[in-house]
Each structure stands twice: as C-alpha cells, then as structure tokens.
Curated annotation (Swiss-Prot):
Organism this protein belongs to: Bos taurus
Cytoplasmic side stretches: 59-127
Family matches, as Pfam families: Acyltransferase
Lumenal domain ranges by topology: 27-37, 149-287
EC number in record: 2.3.1.51
Motif placement: HXXXXD motif: 104-109
Domain statement: The HXXXXD motif is essential for acyltransferase activity and may constitute the binding site for the phosphate moiety of the glycerol-3-phosphate.
Membrane topology: Multi-pass membrane protein
Protein's name according to its UniProt entry: 1-acyl-sn-glycerol-3-phosphate acyltransferase alpha
Highest taxon, organism lineage: Eukaryota
Family under the similarity heading: Belongs to the 1-acyl-sn-glycerol-3-phosphate acyltransferase family.
TM annotation in the entry: 38-58, 128-148
Amino acid sequence: MELWPGAGTLLLLLFLLLLLLLPTLWFCSPSAKYFFKMAFYNGWILFLAVLAIPVCAVRGRNVENMKILRLMLLHIKYLYGIRVEVRGAHHFPPSQPYVVVSNHQSSLDLLGMMEVLPGRCVPIAKRELLWAGSAGLACWLAGVIFIDRKRTGDAISVMSEVAQTLLTQDVRVWVFPEGTRNHNGSMLPFKRGAFHLAVQAQVPIVPIVMSSYQDFYCKKERRFTSGRCQVRVLPPVPTEGLKPDDVPALADRVRHSMLTVFREISTDGRGGGDYLKKPGGVGEAGL
C-alpha cells in the first residue's frame, strides 16, 4: 500500500491548488493583478507577432508591414479598459517626410503609438528588441530601425542612412528622445539624435505628447487599472535652414513645448500633482 500519491496525482493536486489560488490573488492582491496583467500584455504581443510574421513575410522587410502590426495591436486597449483620445491629428504634414518625437513612459506607449501612427512611419528602437523573439522578427519585417546605443559611431552612421531614407523613400520615423522609459511622471532630458536627424534631412519635427499614466498605471506601486490616456499631436516644427549648431536650442524648444502640454493634459486621479513638478532639461549631445 502506497503512503504517498504518485507523481501524476501530486502534479494534479498542485495544478488544482494553483487554479484556486489565482482567483484569490486576482481579487485580493493588487500587486498580483499587476503582474498578471503585465505578463498577459507581453505574452499577448508575442503571440500576435507570431500571427503577423507569415503575413508580413510575403512582402519581406517593408515599412508597409507596419499597417499589419497596427491592425493587430489596436484592440489591446479594449482588453485593459484604456480609452485613448487623440487630438491634433490634423497637424501631421500630409505629403512629406518628418520626424516624430514622443515622450516615453512604459511599454504601454505602444497603445498610444498604434492609435495615432501615421502612414509609412516606423519607430527607431534599441537593437536589443531585435532579439525579443517573435516581436523582434515582426518589427524587423515592418521596417523598424534598430540602433546600438552603446556604440555611438554606429548609431551616428545609422542616423545618416535614415536621413537619406527619409528623403528617397518617403518614410517617417518615430523617436523617443528621452532614450529610455521614464516612470517619474515627467520627462527625462532629451538626447539630440532625433533633432540632428531632422536638421540633416531638413524635414519637420512633429512632437507627440502622451498624458501621464499615473492615475491608472504605476510600476513602483504595482498598480494597473483601467483609465484614460490623451495623445496630443502638436504643430510641426520646421527645420529648414537650420544647421547642427542650432540643434541644442531646437531640442530645448521642442522639449519645453512638450512638457508644457504634458502638464496640461495629465491628471493625477488620486488628488496629487507633485509628480508633474520634477525638474529636468535637455541632455548632452548623444543618441
């Protein structure tokens, strides 16, 4: 007579215990709910990328494949109860290349980006994303431009090539000039690569501001609920006649206008507002 259950029975009991535990954690632990939601968010994107790859592969690496990725990702906001409001979309130049610069708060920026992404527009992303499984391959097929931020020389070379691509292939690029995600509810100093790119190509800069997520999402507090995000497209900033020496002032001017709008459209649903008052400025030259 066996005193202990077999391995199969033990695994079944553990599985049943997990099924009972998950709903308890979901309703009783905001932190657990946060991790579940983020795990599903990332996992769902990887799954959608698997579905997109065969469709995108028909064209090969092509900026038009970004339309396929956008179509497949637009529904995610509904799964999380996030309402995305777009204002100022008429500011996009109708028939010329340009550089989009946007603030960068978290991976949820993808929702706002897909909502407002103009035609023939691709992001510039860090090279590490290229190795992110199915998502990396789907991004490559969609024409996403990858740069190695640790190798400044290579990044500058890529930017020079991008400037030529903008003009010869009628492409727009989307850049996060903060260079990394910013969770403090303000804006980090801007790196100047996007502005050098726009000046080199003599194309306009289109600033896009996404309101703070603090009322429904906070990584530090492990909080992720439903909420509203406003995406504001600002009037294009011309660069005709500007030279490399004008880049610092240009970056400072664009950041100031974006920060002003960010403070205007952002609200703290829990009654605070101090997170919008943190100082910052334009960073040293770099990418």
